[in-house]
C-alpha cells in the first residue's frame, strides 16, 4: 500500500475542526457489509491510537455507551491506513485476546496523548503491556501469532470496504458510515448514530 504523506494524513485525520455539513450526515456503504451479530444492530467504531481526534472522541462514546440499548451491539476496530498503524492494531487485538482491554485501551490513549509518551513499536508496546501487569512473553506470543496477523489484515480489508477516509469513523449495521467531519461535531455524530439505529429498527 502506498504510504500516506504527513500532509495527507493530517487531512485524513481531520475531524472536529471541519464544521461544514454535508447534505447527509452519513454515507451509504455499497454493497452492505456483514456484521458479527444476526440479532442486534451493530455500531462499529473505527479508530487509531495515534489519532488525537480519536482520543478526543473517547469520552463522548464512553458516555454514550452507558445507555446502550439492549438491541445494539457495540464493537471497535482499529483502522489501518499505512504500515505504521499496524503495531497499534495488533496491540488492540492482542489486548482483546488476552482479556485486558480494560487495562490497555483507555490507558494507552492517555499515555500517547496526555502523557506524550512514545509507544509505537512492538518493544514499546510490550513495555507498556508489562507496566499494566501483562506477562511479556505472553504478550510477544500473542502479538506475533497468526491469529493476530489475520485479524489486522481483515481490519485493513474491512476499512477499504467501508470506504473510510479518516478516523474516528462509525459504521452502523454495515450500511452507513458517519464521522464528525460529516456531522460537524461529536455531539451531532452521536445524534446521527442514534438516528441510524432508529432507522434500522424500522
Give residue ranges: language-model regions.
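Extracytoplasmic thiol/disulfide redox context detector
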Residues: 3-86, 156, 160-161, 195-202
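C-terminal cap of thioredoxin/glutaredoxin-like
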Residues: 5, 131-202
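Solvent-exposed loop/turn segments at secondary-structure junctions
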Residues: 50-53, 80-84, 110-114, 148, ...
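Alpha-helix N-cap/helix-start motif
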Residues: 54, 84-85, 118, 182, ...
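Structural microenvironment flanking redox-active thiols in thiol-disulfide oxidoreductases
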Residues: 67-97, 103-130
